[in-house]
Amino acid sequence: MPGWSCLVTGAGGFVGQRIIRMLVQEKELQEVRALDKVFRPETKEEFSKLQTKAKVTMLEGDILDAQYLRRACQGISVVIHTAAVIDVSHVLPRQTILDVNLKGTQNILEACVEASVPAFIYCSTVDVAGPNSYKKIILNGHEEEHHESTWSDAYPYSKRMAEKAVLAANGSILKNGGTLHTCALRPMYIYGERSPFLSVMILAALKNKGILNVTGKFSIANPVYVGNVAWAHILAARGLRDPKKSQNVQGQFYYISDDTPHQSYDDLNCTLSKEWGLRLDSSWSLPLPLLYWLAFLLETVSFLLRPFYNYRPPFNCHLVTLSNSKFTFSYKKAQRDLGYVPLVSWEEAKQKTSEWIGTLVEQHRETLDTKSQ
């Protein structure tokens, strides 16, 4: 493989940062362009200190700016597209989510054609496959089975339509006469250091006497460590660039999981944080069917009030289903086509994540000490 270059969108995000840190170690890599709307100062500093022979360029720009994207893609060999808005709680306007997740993906696909970028990897999500009902059990599902989300909620809908656009773009003719090859990765729920979801949950527990909120005790999930998700993207980039592997990877999607034990989301949260004295709420909780119908009732109230008042329910039907389904997938196809084997073991992932949670606990205590002085 001759010298090559890569653009990573969403490079300042949870997954994007990990991809950058791994990517700069790749052989023959000449340049990495890290694109995000805004980079935090600490991320800029971290990227500037990366030990690499490759040139690392940070670009701050909007995924909705088509002209900017075309310039960012000039001279690039591979695009890894992770930029997205993740919102399953209906916090953001629907159109904002559709603009970033769907229109933004369409924009960068068009930029790849205009700039003659031959390889495109999309960071999708298992949410594009469901779950559609907490009553339907899917354990160790795989790509040959047809699973497709039927939710109209903005996040799963936008990611599903964006993935379809990416896979449909495979085989597109580039401006220089070449061919665009694409693939999509569908990670499970991603955990690890700097997880925005874990941060919110841990800080909420610390403000609630160390009690973790119970949200998904009925689920069976196979969460995946962020380092392994990043590794899968590196292997996908290699696969699309390797003439021997590319034929099998083009136009394909892959479920990305690892060897994290299958467990409920609540059990995962407890396992990762119990060393620091955090514990699950042991009080009585609503039965799952009743919780679902309460969510439906709250969504109905929200809809009826919309002309007069913007009421956002604390939970919704999609979130209840997502958090409480038995829904797991195998990574065997990624292993077969990409050579994917988890880089980080469960024990190591658990230790690293727990240590990071410890820093959040310590920061919280320091904040309380400062306020009490």
From Swiss-Prot:
Gene: Hsd3b1
Tissue specificity comment: Adrenal glands, kidney, testes and ovaries.
Reaction(s) this enzyme catalyzes, per UniProt: a 3beta-hydroxy-Delta(5)-steroid + NAD(+) = a 3-oxo-Delta(5)-steroid + NADH + H(+); pregnenolone + NAD(+) = pregn-5-ene-3,20-dione + NADH + H(+); 3beta-hydroxyandrost-5-en-17-one + NAD(+) = androst-5-ene-3,17-dione + NADH + H(+); androst-5-en-3beta,17beta-diol + NAD(+) = 17beta-hydroxy-androst-5-en-3-one + NADH + H(+)
GO cellular component, one term: mitochondrial inner membrane
Cell compartment(s), UniProt: Endoplasmic reticulum membrane; Mitochondrion membrane
Bilayer topology term: Single-pass membrane protein
Annotated catalytic residues: 159 (proton donor)
Gene3D superfamilies: NAD(P)-binding Rossmann-like Domain
Listed GO biological process terms: adrenal gland development; androgen biosynthetic process; biphenyl metabolic process; C21-steroid hormone metabolic process; cellular response to antibiotic; cellular response to cAMP; cellular response to dexamethasone stimulus; cellular response to fibroblast growth factor stimulus
Gene Ontology MF: a single term: 3-beta-hydroxysteroid 3-dehydrogenase (NADP+) activity
Residues noted as binding NADP(+) in the record, renumbered to the chain: 10-15, 155, 159
EC number in record: 1.1.1.145, 1.1.1.270, 1.1.1.210, 5.3.3.1
SUPFAM superfamilies: NAD(P)-binding Rossmann-fold domains (SSF51735)
Similarity comment: Belongs to the 3-beta-HSD family.
Transmembrane stretches, start-end: 288-308
Native source species: Rattus norvegicus
UniProt keyword list: Endoplasmic reticulum, Isomerase, Lipid metabolism, Membrane, Mitochondrion, Multifunctional enzyme, NAD, NADP, Oxidoreductase, Steroid metabolism, Steroidogenesis, Transmembrane, Transmembrane helix
Official protein name in the record: 3 beta-hydroxysteroid dehydrogenase/Delta 5-->4-isomerase type 1
Pathway assignment: Steroid hormone biosynthesis; Steroid metabolism
Role, per record: A bifunctional enzyme responsible for the oxidation and isomerization of 3beta-hydroxy-Delta(5)-steroid precursors to 3-oxo-Delta(4)-steroids, an essential step in steroid hormone biosynthesis. Specifically catalyzes the conversion of pregnenolone to progesterone, dehydroepiandrosterone (DHEA) to 4-androstenedione, and androstenediol to testosterone. Additionally, catalyzes the interconversion between 3beta-hydroxy and 3-oxo-5alpha-androstane steroids controlling the bioavalability of the active forms.
